[in-house]
A protein has these predicted regions:
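Conserved Rossmann-fold cofactor-binding substructure of NAD(P)-dependent oxidoreductases
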Residues: 65-77
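Helix N-cap at the beta1-alpha1 junction of Rossmann-like dinucleotide-binding domains, i.e.
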Residues: 36-40
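Rossmann-like dinucleotide-binding core of oxidoreductases
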Residues: 127-157
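N-terminal Rossmann-fold NAD(P) dinucleotide-binding loop
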Residues: 14-15
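Rossmann-fold NAD(P)-binding glycine/threonine-rich loop
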Residues: 108-129
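ADP-ribose/adenylate-binding Rossmann-like module
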Residues: 85-87, 97-115
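Conserved N-terminal Rossmann-fold NAD(P)-binding element of oxidoreductases
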Residues: 5-11
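Rossmann-fold cofactor-recognition segment
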Residues: 51-67
């Protein structure tokens, strides 16, 4: 089954996330890169396509700055996950889209006020919300779990 992932924000972190997801997922993905900058979208898509050996779809969505638009709504309707790589102040807005369009949600922000607002939104969500998944502790926890699972499989612990 193809997992469709919307990445909000196509700056350095968003483009890196897109490349990693496309190249290293153990399942098939379609990546939707969203940003308010057409130039960021162009650069991010180019980076992903040039540096990935996979052939899965990478689409770009020009996002509205303060609201949604038809392209965003169409992408949200089709996506399973919203990975929020947008500036922290945008996180509650992205989380609201995840609730409204029944997408799972993960964000990287460590902004306390925004995280508290997202926790309130997540209480009514029908999907999973994973907050503060940035480098530390987020990525470190994912990496540690992966290493643990490999160790467990190899040594039967």
């Amino acid at each position: 089954m193809i997992k469709k992932i919307f990445i909000a924000g196509s700056g350095g972190i968003g483009e890196a996330a897109a490349l990693l997801l496309r190249e290293w997922c153990e399942f098939e993905t379609e990546i939707f890169l969203g940003d308010v900058s057409g130039e960021n979208l162009r650069k991010a898509k180019e980076l992903v396509l040039q540096n990935s050996g996979k052939t899965s779809k990478v689409e770009t969505i020009l996002m509205a700055k303060d609201d949604s638009n038809e392209a965003m709504n169409a992408a949200f309707e089709n996506c399973d996950v919203l990975l929020d790589c947008s500036p922290g102040a945008q996180s509650p807005r992205m989380a609201r889209y995840a609730v409204d369009f029944k997408m799972h949600y993960a964000n990287l922000t460590e902004y306390v006020a925004e995280t508290d607002e997202i926790i309130t939104l997540a209480k009514d969500a029908e999907t999973g919300f994973v907050l503060q998944t940035g480098l530390a502790p987020g990525f470190i926890n994912v990496l540690a779990m992966s290493l643990y699972q490999k160790f467990q499989a190899q040594f039967g612990v």
